Amino acid sequence: MDVDNGEGQVQVHLKTKQEQYAVPDVPYAIDGTVTTVELNTFVNALLRQKDGSSDTDFDFLVFDEYLRGRLCDHLREKAISFEDAIEIEYVERFPAPEPQDCLLHDDWVSAVKARGKWILSGCYDNSLNLWTNKGKHILTISGHTAPIKAVDWISLDEETGRFVSTSQDQTAMLWKWNVGSNAVDCVSVCKGHERGVDSVSVSPDGLRFATGSWDTMLKVWSAELDDGVEGSSKRMKESGVRTPKITLQGHRESVSAVQWMDATTLLTGSWDYTLKVWDLSLEGIKTEISTNKSIFDASYSKLNRLILTASADKNLRLYDPRTNQGSVVRNTYLGHNAWVQTVMWSTTEEFLFVSGAYDNQNKLWDCRSPKAPLYDLLGHGDKVLDIDWSNPKYIVSGGVDNTVRVFKSRKALAEDTETK
């Protein structure tokens, strides 16, 4: 069997975790030159023999990586012996997200965050905007005196929404929105940073938020309506000025990314080429991961406990904060043609994430497919500055073309199908 030359047959076992698509667990002899096209044809033929199923599109994993070319080339690259049967796992292909809306703004959109049926955006004209996820503009909010850099929701119910924004004006601002009357009040102006505030993240319980700044500092603040700080001056309370609960020093350049990993642990990424994991109970650094590029964004998945970075090159990188070899890259994802500005894991799909870059493109990835994204999400006419997948139904992104692009993901597409 001359599989090394891309000829002959290979013995395979076909496995799936989706029981409705299972085929008999027996060895199959297939040509070494097969691709996903031929494997799809083969598996669907077996399923038709089994129960008359209609055709389904599948992706195939060989040794935990998506098959993107010929099977023999994949095995050769992995230095896999052809003596034993090869296990191929197949999964139903994730459907391509569909463009839904283009939300027009007056300036660059540098921050987006979706929650429930609402989208919050922040712009370089210093304004915040609220939209429905169906594309209706609800409100423009003024208050900051310099471009917005980051936003996050604190809480949301039928009556009230609360959120935080950060800006190059060196402040974070806490807002309370009355949904019924569509009125917004600034609850507090958070002062303490000495340069622009680049990143923000609200704690899982909604009681605190963290900010990262060009002053290299990480600060933790109360997100409660009454921050309950004993001894705060009457003047500060009446003026709505809020000061940080904790200030953490350790980065040498801008703290461009911050995210709560759990109730007492924070992840930060910086232009100083490092990721840091902070233990708030000790108020110190728990883990440091050195990288070889400035980090523009970082995302931690609570589902798989891995970290992705977007950096000052064309690549995304995957790290495991639990390993003793903290500087070792677990995987590199190739596909963008310019600096990658923003990245975010799915909150519901363990292996999926999205990215946006200076090549004007968003991409949807599976972390088991490092050589190519699953899909390109086209529409932006200029650099992408921020991307969000907080709402499992929608992928939203903002960019230099003054727009927010909204794409329906699988959950929204499934709901559309059910209502037809």
Swiss-Prot record:
It is found in: Nucleus, Nucleolus; Nucleus, Nucleoplasm. GO terms for biological process: maturation of 5.8S rRNA from tricistronic rRNA transcript (SSU-rRNA, 5.8S rRNA, LSU-rRNA); maturation of LSU-rRNA from tricistronic rRNA transcript (SSU-rRNA, 5.8S rRNA, LSU-rRNA). One of its GO terms (molecular function) is ribonucleoprotein complex binding. WD repeats lie at residues 104-142, 143-185, 192-231, 250-288, 290-329, 335-375, 379-417. One of its GO terms (cellular component) is PeBoW complex. Keywords: Nucleus, Repeat, Ribosome biogenesis, rRNA processing, WD repeat. Signal peptide: none annotated. Its main location: nucleus. Required for maturation of ribosomal RNAs and formation of the large ribosomal subunit. This is Ribosome biogenesis protein WDR12 homolog. It comes from Drosophila sechellia.
